[in-house]
C-alpha cells in the first residue's frame, strides 16, 4: 500500500510539474526573446537561449514614440490606476457600511440588483456608457476611467466589504454611540480599522484591474501622449510596416512587474 501511494504521489507531482512548465513556458519565452534582436525573434523561436544577449530592445522601447518616452506612459497608468483605486475603495466601503448596518426600504432589492450587475458582461454597457460620456464631454480625457469608480460601481468590492462588516459585532457600534460617536465616527473609527484586510484586498485587485485595462483606454483616450502602458504597447505593432516585437516584449515585462 505504501509503495502504491508513493508511486501515485510521484506520478501526481510529475504531472503537476509538467503542467506548470507548460503554463510558464510562454512567459519564459517572452522574457528570453526580449534579449534577442527583433529580426531573429521568430527565426529562432524554438530556442529559448539567445545566441547573443542584447539590451537594445529595452533601450529602444524606453525611448517611446514621437518624443514621448515610455516613462510618460507608466506615469499615466499609475495616475489612472491609483485614482480609480482610491475611488473604488472609498465608495465601496461607504456603500458596504450602508448595506450591512442600516435598514431602509428596498434594501434587499437594491442589493440583489447590485449582485446581478456583476453578471452583466462589460460589453452590454459599453455603448450606452460611451454615448453618455460623449454628451458630458468626457471622451478624450481620463474622466471616464476615474470618476465612475467614486460611485461604487463595482459590486464585487461592495459585496466583499459588506460581508466583512456584517461579521463585526453590532455591540461595538452601540458602545461607540453611547460614548457619543455619530454614524460617521463609528464608520471611520470602528469599522474601517476592523476591515483593513478587505480594504487592502479591494485595493490590490482594483489596482491590478485598472493597470491591465486596455479596452476602456482604447475607447476614451485619443491622444498618444495620454496613453496608459496597456494601450501604448500596441504602438509597437504596425500592420503597414515592420513591428518591433522585441521592444514590445521588453516594455511588457516592465509593465507586468
Task: Give the positions of each predicted feature.
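A structural signal for multi-pass alpha-helical bundles of membrane permease subunits
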Residues: 2-255
